[in-house]
Amino acid sequence: PPVLDDRTVRLSFSAAGTLGDIGKTQLEISSPGHLDLKADAAAKNLLDANRMEASARFEGDFRDLAFLKALLPDTVLRRRVAIPALIRLRGSAGADRGTFSTASTLSADGGELSVKGRFNPREQSYDAAIRADSFPLNSFLPADSLGIVDLALQARGTGFDPLLPRTRTSLRAQIDRAEFGGRDFGGIELDAELDSQRLSGRISDRDEALRLLLSVSGTLTEREQRIGLS
């Protein structure tokens, strides 16, 4: 595409080891004035997912990438989306005998969005957390009346089918600030738990106009799906 014709990119990659055991891998990608990305990794038993042990770290600075909007296929979408002048990404990922994990933080315009999680597909177990600290949604979607967000989400459990007895999960969400249209809709909390096909939880909102407090209860089985609010 013409927008990329005058952008210089440098790439460096090195690896040592075998296809089964990679002792060290390094990757560097840079584009003057726009991109600096570095990553390193190592892995053992790479071809066996149940025995694989691997770790990786990455960090990158992304500057003045607004020109990339020209690559979007929709003119309307190009008008709605923005790319902050500086975006920083830091994180790590790993695998340990069937369990996969990641932790990363994205920073832009004075705010941060962090993700941390662990997942084992064989055991169907998961533990994930998302946190936003003064994260500027308006820096990415300026036309949607969105503003700053402060929130924390956490989910953990075992099993994916909510109708099975073995499935257990808990969810907690706390939204301290959620700006929309110049107003703060924060103060929402959600706690929910599913255990032995029994659902329980509560929803609250400290907004003076709502003062919401709801209890959630229910039963989830293959024969009956019932959820009530009180």
Language-model region placement:
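Interface amphipathic segments
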Residues: 1-230
